[in-house]
């Protein structure tokens, strides 16, 4: 318990307590994966303690039915007579190790591997038999009686992947891939396409190969011995779900069932560090990395190369964008990844000409050389040439001082520039020729619409087109084919384009974002940017600094393989789809996610299926690596089991990607129809196929508990700026669509359904550092419990914080008591508090003020995404509010914007969530 006294605001507390509705607690959807959490020991589960090997000395016995099943699988796996795959006995791996390594006299062999008093692997039991596998169970609920919906479900893990320990060589928590790396929409896979089609549930994978901006945070285990074992036929990598056969001399692939030879090197260990094959990372860990040998490398891993293409036209200078960019670069030169000290830098300034800079070595300064920093202007935009290419892309280490010197001079050089033109297209081509030999990143910082040379864009006429069927074709399409065709050239030479667009004017984000979409980059949009607003500078500088300091890998390709019957069919995210199943990333960022759609092409005959994602990459430390992510999933012929194992967050991500594609290629109306139809189809199928009896009229709206947030997420998605009907500036809508198609899952969910916190009555410990059980203080701040995103829970005197992942809104109720206003803002008059994009002032001797600022800082603290949320302070309506207050118009706009994030409410022409459910109920009852 906290010893901090809770500040009580009498009027607010009494009224809030009378009207508050306690949050509903989510039902326990499935048995916990951790036996300890269920009050069971690993021995009771038939599992060894964590970190221990499988039980040893117990050969695996098969029933006649099991032997027949293995024979059928073997015979179907190959038509090659000389492989002798059928009738191969399955042998327990520890039995093999016991035969190979004799125990020392008087000492038991590996005491930690002695058999536990548990079921012997391979012998079916009531819980683990072929026909009685443990599976997730359905928990039916009525959506209409669960209002407001229990939003704590949004933070629950997905339904467990129920894989018995005998299916793993070394059972442990890391033997199957964590949902942080890969999540399947279905954690029980239909055995045939007809069942999948009947379910109306999508089958897809949400993949995030990297979890942090910086690779030194929680890296997966690495194999450095150069031994990479792969299946001869399907080319899958050895993983925790293969089986050793023929006394361990061969291994059976869990993807295609082929028997492969085991390399002798697997059992050759360092005498000073003896290990068995079961200690190898590929056997123990579903997520791991290999140091790639030469055969995986076409050329020496290239140096990380950054080409900064900076807008120096009049608009960029006036807005303060140029000065902000240069200052941020100056402060973060040492943060740019340079692990192998080969990182190279180039800087181009662009207006109606391209300004190159020749940067000499720092050593030349010390030797009295006359070689100086020179600027070379190229005005021929049709065929721009490179005046001195060898001295314009320079080593960050060898030229560090001169790069800094150049950056300090650039604002002075262009401070009086009156040119309004910005030749982005020719500048991109010049940068392409400059770094095309090795590849790298082109980072564009622009405050002006490209209006000169190839790729010239014009302002589109939005009047009469916004919120019509023509919006996609005329406002969200690419205005000039250059921005798509150029990405093809970039992909061939391993170049990524990132965009930082900051302007008070139209930027045509819809056209420009194609540069990053197809080169594995990102588009960052800062509407209304002004260097006079410190909050704009902080947001841009923070995100730009985190972006250029983020670790990256070059020359990257990613492929997902499925076991027999599974095939990857569609791919969503920012990359170049080089072939039918190969996704190419010139550079792979650390803050994006990807979605692959999976088809069940043929009937799956096995009880378990597998997905393996392989990422081949070059790191900034001159290493070529392969990251492997392996996922095992049970299969089923039961529609109820499919529904019981559906992952509502992954399904929401799937339909989000589909809707973004539909909005960009067809129309926003079709995207909204797709979103709503996804809910209707699932509800109708559940009612028809799962519910035992149907009653007319007052029938409940049934769904399983693990999917009860799905209708809420889809309804909220239709109110997102990317999809909602109404007048939305095309730049804002295009930027919103761009964000949705690449956000990691947890931030996507927050973007769709914002977190809302009540601050005026938060718990005593909220806003204070978290304390461990030992009483030690951590850097993590305790957050209040979130509320449902509806104004019906807002009190007129309360203080609320809304976090949608992009912005923070601090809503101060118009009738808040003076004590609360003073504790937060240091003034008792609510009409004196700052409004709009502001920061909360520091109020001395106010613990409550400190706690509120701590919460805001905690919400902004990310090590896996570069976003920094600006804070908007909103004053709620009040009967005592002056009619002609100076900020009345701004306040009204802010209230409308903040209210649009309360997605359970009726917003403009969109119905409330309760009304949405009633509409769905009426549709499926027809």
Curated annotation (Swiss-Prot):
InterPro entries: ADF-H/Gelsolin-like_dom_sf, Gelsolin-like_dom, Gelsolin-like_dom_sf, Sec23/24_helical_dom, Sec23/24_helical_dom_sf, Sec23/24_trunk_dom, Sec23_24_beta_S, SEC23_SEC24_subfamily
Region called Zinc finger-like, residue ranges: 231-256
GO biological process: COPII-coated vesicle cargo loading; intracellular protein transport
Bilayer disposition of the protein: Peripheral membrane protein
Region (Disordered): 1-54
Pfam families documented for this protein: Gelsolin (PF00626), Sec23_BS (PF08033), Sec23_helical (PF04815), Sec23_trunk (PF04811), zf-Sec23_Sec24 (PF04810)
Keywords of the record: Cytoplasm, Cytoplasmic vesicle, Endoplasmic reticulum, ER-Golgi transport, Golgi apparatus, Membrane, Metal-binding, Protein transport, Transport, Zinc
Matching Gene3D superfamilies: beta-sandwich domain of Sec23/24, Sec23/Sec24 helical domain, Severin, von Willebrand factor, type A domain, Zn-finger domain of Sec23/24
GO cellular component: COPII vesicle coat; endoplasmic reticulum exit site; endoplasmic reticulum membrane; Golgi membrane
Major localization listed first in the record, in broad terms: cytoplasm
Localization annotation: Cytoplasm; Cytoplasmic vesicle, COPII-coated vesicle membrane; Endoplasmic reticulum membrane; Golgi apparatus membrane
Residues annotated as binding Zn(2+): 231, 234, 253, 256
Start-end of Low complexity biased regions: 20-54
UniProt GO MF annotations: SNARE binding; zinc ion binding
Domain of life: Eukaryota
Role noted for this protein: Component of the coat protein complex II (COPII) which promotes the formation of transport vesicles from the endoplasmic reticulum (ER). The coat has two main functions, the physical deformation of the endoplasmic reticulum membrane into vesicles and the selection of cargo molecules.
Family stated for the protein in its record: Belongs to the SEC23/SEC24 family. SEC24 subfamily.
PANTHER family with a match to the protein in the record: SEC24-RELATED PROTEIN, SECRETORY 24AB, ISOFORM A
Subunit details: The COPII coat is composed of at least 5 proteins: the SEC23/24 complex, the SEC13/31 complex, and the protein SAR1. Golgi apparatus membrane; Peripheral membrane protein; Cytoplasmic side.
Protein name (Swiss-Prot/TrEMBL): Protein transport protein SEC24-2
Organism: Saccharomyces uvarum (strain ATCC 76518 / CBS 7001 / CLIB 283 / NBRC 10550 / MCYC 623 / NCYC 2669 / NRRL Y-11845)
């Amino acid at each position: 318990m906290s010893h901090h006294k809770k500040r009580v605001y009498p009027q607010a507390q009494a009224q809030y307590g009378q009207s508050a509705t306690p949050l509903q607690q989510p039902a326990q959807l499935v048995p916990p994966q951790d036996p300890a959490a269920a009050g069971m020991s690993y021995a009771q589960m038939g599992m060894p303690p964590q970190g221990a090997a499988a039980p040893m000395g117990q050969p695996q016995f098969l029933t006649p039915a099991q032997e027949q099943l293995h024979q059928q699988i073997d015979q179907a796996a190959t038509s090659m007579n000389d492989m002798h795959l059928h009738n191969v006995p399955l042998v327990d791996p520890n039995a093999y190790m016991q035969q190979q390594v004799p125990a020392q006299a008087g000492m038991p062999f590996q005491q930690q591997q002695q058999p536990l008093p548990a079921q012997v692997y391979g012998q079916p039991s009531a819980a683990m038999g072929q026909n009685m596998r443990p599976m997730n169970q359905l928990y039916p609920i009525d959506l209409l009686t669960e209002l407001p919906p229990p939003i704590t479900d949004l933070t629950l893990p997905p339904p467990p992947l129920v894989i018995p320990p005998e299916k793993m060589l070394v059972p442990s928590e890391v033997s199957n891939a964590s949902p942080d790396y890969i999540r399947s929409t279905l954690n029980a896979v239909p055995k045939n396409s007809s069942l999948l089609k009947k379910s109306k549930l999508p089958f897809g994978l949400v993949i995030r190969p990297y979890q942090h901006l910086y690779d030194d945070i929680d890296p997966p285990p690495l194999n450095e011995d150069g031994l990479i074992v792969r299946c001869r036929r399907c080319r899958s990598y050895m993983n925790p779900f293969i089986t050793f056969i023929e006394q361990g001399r061969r291994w059976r692939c869990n993807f295609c069932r082929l028997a492969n030879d085991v390399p002798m090197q697997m059992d050759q260990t360092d005498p000073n560090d003896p290990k068995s094959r079961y200690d190898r990372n590929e056997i123990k860990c579903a997520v791991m990395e290999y140091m790639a040998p030469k055969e995986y490398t076409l050329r020496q891993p290239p140096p990380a190369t950054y080409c900064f293409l900076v807008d120096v036209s009049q608009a960029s200078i006036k807005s303060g964008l140029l000065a902000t960019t240069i200052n941020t670069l100056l402060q973060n030169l040492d943060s740019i990844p340079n692990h192998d000290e080969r990182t190279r830098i180039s800087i181009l300034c662009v207006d109606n000409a391209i300004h190159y800079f020749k940067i000499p070595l720092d050593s030349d300064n010390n030797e009295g050389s006359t070689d100086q920093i020179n600027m070379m202007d190229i005005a021929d935009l049709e065929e721009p040439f490179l005046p001195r290419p060898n001295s314009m892309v320079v080593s960050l280490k060898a030229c560090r001082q001169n790069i800094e010197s150049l950056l300090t001079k650039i604002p002075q050089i262009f401070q009086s520039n009156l040119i309004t033109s910005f030749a982005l297209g020719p500048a991109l081509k010049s940068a392409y020729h400059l770094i095309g030999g090795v590849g790298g990143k082109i980072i564009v910082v622009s405050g002006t619409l490209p209006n000169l040379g190839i790729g010239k864009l014009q302002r589109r006429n939005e009047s009469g087109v916004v919120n019509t069927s023509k919006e996609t074709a005329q406002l969200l399409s690419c205005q000039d084919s250059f921005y798509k065709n150029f990405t093809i050239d970039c992909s061939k030479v391993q170049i990524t384009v990132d965009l930082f667009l900051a302007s008070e004017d139209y930027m045509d984000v819809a056209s420009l974002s194609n540069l990053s979409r197809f080169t594995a980059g990102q588009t960052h949009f800062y509407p209304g940017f002004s260097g006079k607003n410190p909050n704009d500078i902080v947001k841009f500088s923070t995100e730009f600094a985190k972006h250029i300091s983020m670790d990256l890998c070059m020359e990257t390709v990613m492929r997902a393989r499925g076991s027999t019957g599974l095939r990857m069919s569609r791919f969503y995210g920012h990359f170049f789809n080089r072939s039918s199943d190969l996704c190419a990333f010139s550079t792979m960022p650390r803050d994006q996610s990807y979605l692959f759609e999976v088809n069940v092409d043929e009937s799956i005959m096995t009880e378990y299926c597998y997905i393996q994602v392989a990422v081949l990459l070059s790191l900034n430390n001159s290493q070529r690596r392969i990251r492997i992510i392996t996922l095992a999933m049970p299969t089923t012929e039961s529609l109820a089991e499919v529904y019981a194992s559906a992952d509502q967050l992954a399904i929401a991500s799937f339909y989000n990607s589909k809707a973004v594609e539909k909005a960009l290629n067809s129309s926003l109306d079709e995207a909204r129809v797709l979103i709503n139809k996804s809910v209707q189809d699932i509800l109708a199928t559940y009612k028809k196929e799962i519910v035992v009896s149907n009653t007319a009229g007052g029938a409940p709206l049934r769904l399983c508990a693990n999917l009860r947030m799905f209708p809420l997420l889809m309804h909220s998605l239709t109110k997102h700026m990317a999809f909602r009907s109404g007048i939305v500036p095309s730049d804002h809508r295009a930027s919103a669509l761009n964000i949705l198609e690449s956000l990691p899952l947890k931030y996507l969910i927050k973007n769709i359904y914002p977190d809302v916190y009540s601050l005026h009555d938060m718990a005593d410990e909220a806003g204070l550092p978290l304390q461990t059980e030992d009483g030690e203080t951590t850097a993590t701040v305790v957050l209040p419990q979130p509320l449902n995103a509806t104004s019906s829970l807002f009190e007129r005197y309360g203080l609320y914080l809304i976090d949608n992942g992009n912005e923070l809104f601090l809503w101060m109720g118009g009738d808040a008591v003076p004590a609360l206003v003073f504790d937060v803002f240091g003034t008792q008059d609510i009409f004196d508090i700052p409004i709009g994009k502001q920061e909360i002032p520091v109020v001395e001797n106010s613990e409550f003020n400190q706690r509120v600022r701590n919460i805001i800082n905690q919400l902004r603290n990310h090590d896996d995404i570069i976003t920094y949320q600006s804070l908007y302070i909103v004053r709620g309506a009040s009967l005592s509010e002056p009619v002609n207050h100076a900020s009345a118009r701004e306040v009204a706009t802010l209230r409308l914007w903040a209210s649009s994030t309360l997605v359970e409410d009726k917003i403009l022409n969109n119905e409330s969530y309760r009304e949405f459910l009633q509409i769905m109920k009426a549709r499926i009852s027809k």
